[in-house]
Regions:
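Short loop/turn motifs at secondary-structure junctions and domain boundaries
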Residues: 53-58
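Acyl-donor (CoA/ACP) binding surface of acyl/acetyltransferases
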Residues: 1-22, 26-32, 36, 62-162
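Conserved GNAT-fold acetyl-CoA-binding loop/helix
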Residues: 32-52
Length: 162
């Protein structure tokens, strides 16, 4: 995590708008964030296709994370292989301010389907802390069933049951 830059005054979730996608693209292209998330950046075309699929997916629930009037990131949940999954991405300039934690707390309050699973790179301590603060627990049983990572990056699996 980056240095603490002061707590955000307000965090809210809202519908993703077309204009948010440029902000999201910049977040996912940040080299430090890529390393932390252990997730490769997409080029513009791949990114546009990815978000077109998300927005067309009837199982996907997505929101823009807004703090102090600026788009700080995104959060979403979708069904895959019979599980409801969770993902979020917050711009590095917003790390360490409690924004991801507050956004996740709001999101899981609105998305009532359970269980919800989150996969996180073992070295992404900030994201692990966010999940734990929002009552997710590590699911070692799911980790044992998971195939070995194709990219060699060990993942932990967290679940919110209730």
């Amino acid at each position: 995590m980056g240095e603490v830059r002061g707590a955000a005054r307000e965090v809210r979730l809202r519908t993703v708008e077309d204009r948010d996608l440029d902000v999201f693209f910049g977040h996912q292209a940040d080299p430090e964030a890529i390393e932390m998330a252990a997730f490769p950046a997409r080029d513009r075309d791949q990114f546009a296709e990815h978000w077109a699929r998300i927005r067309a997916d009837d199982t996907a629930i997505q929101a823009a994370i807004v703090t102090d009037g600026a788009v700080a990131g995104n959060i979403m949940s979708w069904e895959q292989d019979g599980q409801r999954l969770l993902g979020y991405w917050v711009g590095r300039e917003y790390w360490g301010r409690g924004i991801a934690t507050e956004a996740l707390a709001q999101f899981v309050g609105q998305v009532t389907a359970r269980p919800i699973y989150a996969h996180v790179a073992v070295h992404n301590i900030g994201s692990i802390r966010v999940l734990e603060k929002c009552a997710f627990r590590r699911d070692r049983g799911q980790e044992e069933k998971a195939p070995p990572p194709e990219d060699g990056v060990e993942e932990l699996i967290f679940v919110l049951d209730a």
